[in-house]
């Protein structure tokens, strides 16, 4: 039996091609895209303006990503943390943070992670699999429906390394920012990476207007390699060259992330090179 595919993962262009292959007119694709990415339905039977024969075919070939809320924790400040169970049983975490300017959701891009950062719990079991574009979208849709308020900002800083799931993350960004969907603008999206340099260069060529955050966490290779194995492949000086290329190609500023670990990277001797060598050189700032 052929495995069903996630219709939520298809871009509008891909969905149009699929429907034309079924002998359907092109306008059906936009209607279906609206149902999935604007009206946020999770059942084909809810698509009331579609022919029943088409819905039956779609039901046979596709599914709509609709994770189950396994656990929900809400803090006093309104922050909501979800444990979401995907269709195959894998669980990921999603967090909604409320600010005066709107609601931000932190999404996962993988089930597990293979980057091996010493300070990150999500990497302990390694990477189980990449999430599909539609599954990442469904984190946002599930949270939005649960809180009953619009999600206005996205940070790709949950479980997984976004650039290690490059193609699906690019499709996710296309769908989530589409005017035919929830239409969250690129300037309201932040992507965090540990520094996969080849993928960073590939992202730069896309010239997206998102905000890039690079996990630095150390001023030099000795400390960073001890905290982040990725530094062995792409040491600090190589990463900084890639950051410079990204800035020059996109015209966008890059921010750095720096988790302070007592006795490891929190001394004045660490702070000075971070401030003078990295931040000032790239005209940027760090989130501590």
Language-model region placement:
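Oxyanion-binding "anion nests"
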Residues: 240
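Alpha-helix N-cap and loop-to-helix initiation/capping positions
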Residues: 131, 164, 168, 231-234, ...
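A glycine-rich beta-turn/hairpin centered on an aromatic-Pro dipeptide
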Residues: 274
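Single conserved hydrophobic/aromatic residue that forms the stacking wall/gate
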Residues: 278-281, 285-288
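Conserved strand-turn element in the central/C-terminal portion of the radical SAM core barrel
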Residues: 116, 152-158, 188-194, 223-232, ...
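Conserved Radical SAM active-site core
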Residues: 90-210, 220-222
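Flexible, acidic/Gly-rich N-terminal and inter-domain linker regions that tether
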Residues: 1-103
């Amino acid at each position: 039996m052929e495995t069903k595919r996630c219709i939520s993962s298809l871009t509008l262009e891909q969905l149009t091609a699929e429907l034309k292959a079924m002998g359907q007119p092109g306008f059906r694709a936009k209607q279906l895209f609206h149902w999935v990415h604007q009206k946020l339905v999770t059942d084909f039977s809810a698509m009331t303006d579609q022919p029943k024969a088409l819905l039956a075919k779609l039901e046979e070939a596709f599914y709509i990503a609709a994770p189950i809320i396994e656990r929900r924790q809400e803090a006093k400040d309104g922050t909501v943390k979800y444990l979401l169970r995907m269709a195959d049983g894998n669980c990921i975490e999603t967090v909604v943070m409320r600010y005066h300017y709107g609601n931000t959701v932190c999404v996962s891009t993988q089930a597990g992670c293979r980057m091996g950062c010493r300070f990150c719990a999500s990497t302990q079991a390694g990477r189980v699999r990449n999430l599909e574009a539609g599954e990442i979208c469904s984190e946002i849709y599930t949270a939005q429906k649960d809180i009953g308020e619009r999600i206005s900002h996205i940070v790709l800083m949950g479980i997984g390394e976004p650039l290690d799931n490059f193609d699906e993350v690019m499709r996710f960004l296309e769908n989530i920012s589409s005017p035919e969907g929830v239409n969250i603008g690129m300037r309201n999206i932040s992507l965090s990476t540990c520094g996969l340099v080849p993928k960073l260069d590939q992202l730069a060529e896309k010239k997206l207007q998102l905000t890039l955050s690079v996990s630095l966490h150390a001023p030099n290779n000795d400390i960073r390699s001890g905290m982040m194995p990725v530094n062995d492949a792409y040491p600090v000086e190589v990463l900084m060259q890639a950051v410079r290329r990204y800035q020059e190609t996109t015209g966008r500023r890059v921010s750095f992330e720096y988790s302070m670990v007592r006795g490891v990277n929190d001394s004045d001797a660490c702070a000075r090179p971070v401030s003078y060598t990295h931040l000032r050189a790239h005209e940027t700032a760090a989130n501590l």
